[in-house]
Every structure is written in C-alpha cells, then in structure tokens.
Amino acid sequence: MKAVLKIEFQRLFRSVTFYISMGIGLILTMTQFVMVGLQESMHILDAYSPKGISEPYGVFSSYFGMAGPPLVYRQIYYLILPILAVFAYATTFCVDHNSGYVKNLYTRTNKKYYYAAKYIVSCTAGGLVATIPLVVNLIANMMVLPSLKPVAALGCYAGNGIALWGDIFYTHPYIFMVLYLILIFFYQFIFVSLALLLSTWVNNRFLITLFPFLLNYFSYMMLSFIKKAKYSPIIIMDMTRINALRFGPVVLECVCLTVLFGGVYFWRQKKDEGL
C-alpha cells in the first residue's frame, strides 16, 4: 500500500492537470487581490469616516472570501471548484484504465491498494487546488493591509455572531479562516468521490470532469427552487453566506455524501478486471 501511495503522490506532483487547476484558481484569486486588496492598500483610510459607522480597509474586508464587489471572481471560483478539484488528479483513474496501466499494476499489487491510493491522492489534490489559491490571496492581503479585528457592531461583514463560527470570526478571525479553509478542503471530497465513482463505469475523461460540476449546479437550482439553497455546496463554501449555516448539517452533508460516493467506488473495485 505504501509503495502504491508513494507512486501516486509522485505522479500527482508531476501531473500537468494538477498545476493547470492550481493555476486557474490562482489567476482568479490573485486578480481579485490586484483589483481589491492592492488598490485598498494604497488608500487604507478612504473607507473610514469619523462621523459614520465605518472602519479602514483591512485584511478581512479585502480577503477573497469576504470582500465586496467585484464579486464575479468569487462567484466563478466557487462555481467551478468541482471542475478544478476533479481535473486536478481524479481523471487519471480513467486514463490509467484506457492506457492499460492498471493491467500491469494489478499483476504486481492488490487492486484494492490502487483504489485506496488513487482515492487518497485524488481527494488530497482536489482539496489542495481548492484551498491553496485562497491561502495565497490571504497571505497577499496580510502583506499590504492591517489585520484589523472585525467589529460586529459596525455591520461591515456578511456574518453575524450566531452564524457558522460567527463568534470565532469576531474574536479570533484567523482561526475562523483556518476552519473555513479546512471545511472547503474536505467538501472537495464529495466531487472527487463522485468523479471516481463515475470513472468505474465511464471512460470519458471530459464527462467525468464535468459531471460533478453539472450535478452540483443542478442541485443548487433545485434547492433554490424549494427555498433550501443553504444546503448547496455552492453556498456552504462561500464565507459570505455563513448566516444561513449551522455546523451539524454542514458536516453531516459532507460526511454522508463522501461516504456514499466513496463507498460505492470501493465496492466497484470488486468488478474491476483492469480491462
């Protein structure tokens, strides 16, 4: 198992698709930084008015996950995250079967080790391409803006004190950022698990990449129609929508969907003959 896992991680860090996904994410987050954070760093006091309820520009008001307009970069980012997470490495399952790689591998190791290693590395890759661009944006903002502690009474932020980790945001904002990045990291497991599951039936790399995105967007539309959009991953991963979220349902959704898709994926390995 360790040998197969090591090989898969080596393949990951040599994978062009991993760096393409990471690059797309970085383009979006760093463009937002140039348009918002960098501009605000040159005029930090412009947002402050001693006669009104306001505060100077800071890290948390300019950060990609929390900033105001332009919103297009954040909207695109959260919308295409399923594509980036799956394209990073999960599609190599399909490539391995189409190329005959697994036929050779199954003669030297147990296929359950390959399935487990592929799952671990694919989920890790998906989580990394989703969170590293956000971390880079946060660090960039920290380099040019002051870390002003958020004040709930000012009403400058989307979240309130009773929102998901809202109390943590207003007392220890960097801990809040870490917690939310962890949440986003693990939510990619849903999309990656679904893509790997689909790969056990379909050998079309394009379809495997797009299907989790399409299903995620369709579920968002359906949940919006029945006034339950807060349960959509598109909403859950957006830090500005935390007022509608509660810890229990958010974690339960992530665990249940990941276990469901991942469980069927591992069950399907019994039928895999490497053909």
Question: Where on the chain are the PLM-derived regions?
Answer:
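Central hydrophobic cores of alpha-helical transmembrane segments
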Residues: S21-L26, R205-S219
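Extracellular/periplasmic helix-loop-helix junctions in multi-pass membrane proteins
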Residues: V202, M222-P249
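Helix-loop-helix units of permease transmembrane domains in multi-pass membrane transporters
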Residues: T92-A125
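Junction motif at the cytosolic side of a transmembrane helix
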Residues: L197, V255-L275
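Aromatic- and glycine-rich beta-strand/loop motifs that create alpha-glucan
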Residues: M1-G25
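Juxtamembrane helix-break-helix junctions at the cytosolic face
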Residues: S21, V192-L207
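Membrane-helix interface segments
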Residues: V16-T17, N110-K112, A116, N204-T209
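Secretory targeting signals
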Residues: L26-A90, C94, I120-V192, L196, ...
